[in-house]
Amino acid sequence: YEIPLRLVGSEMCIRDRSRVNVVLKPVAVNGPIMTIRKFPSKAIKMNDLIKMGSLTKEAAEFIRKIVRSKYNIFVSGGTGAGKTTFLNAMSDFIPKEERIITIEDNAELQIQGVENLVRLEAREANLEGEGAVTIRDLIKSALRMRPDRIIVGEVRGEETVDMISSAMLNGHSGSMSTGHANNPKDMLHRIETMMMMGIDLPLQAIQRQVASALDIIIHLGRIRDKTRKVLMIEEILGYEDGKIQTKTLYEFKEVGTENEKVKGSIMKVAELENTGKLVAAGY
């Protein structure tokens, strides 16, 4: 394999989908560093996550219904929270007859059983600064491919404008993505900030777009015993009183510890208010 070497952040995926990151001297003071991030050879399903204790059957069934009913969903969490793994598991609920387009920096998603699947991968510029294909370029291209859903592995910058304004608000309900955030409200603030990087609109107008486009945020995290959990499921209610209004539907409740393991599970704390898509889907 050949990596276009830069001082910082040279990246590539190798044949088994592992992600390789290289940092060189003098930035790496003690010498070159290569980090290899490996992924399971077999896709982790939602039932596997239930067995691991990441969420309950009830929460998984709720997620199955909102995915099949084409709610627009963001998965948030910190580094290593399992966002890509969870997005993979959620995508298994998508009806197999739909046309799905996935867009990623590095092709990590393992969507299976969908015949009409288009996978797009961004490309970095070469050492001469040419040939770059960005996530934003790919979203714009995907919109011309008649998708039923668009799944973006992760949004980090101005491409959020196209994901929110063009995909989710433009008839592609059921679209999904992930983002780094400490909690659902933080995810909303990050989405607003990233959209402001790509479009010249007042904050209020951006907030209205986000509130109209996004339905659900599922927040993941690693708790103190290092296990990964679904910590919160938040509903986006709309825009009112100068801010995006939300409602917590499910929340992780800790009940104690046993053998240094945290005991607890995600519990339902409120009913979904915006049930229109569920009703339209026959639930």
Segments predicted by a language model, with ranges:
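Hydrophobic positions on the alpha1 helix immediately C-terminal to the Walker A/P-loop
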Residues: 86
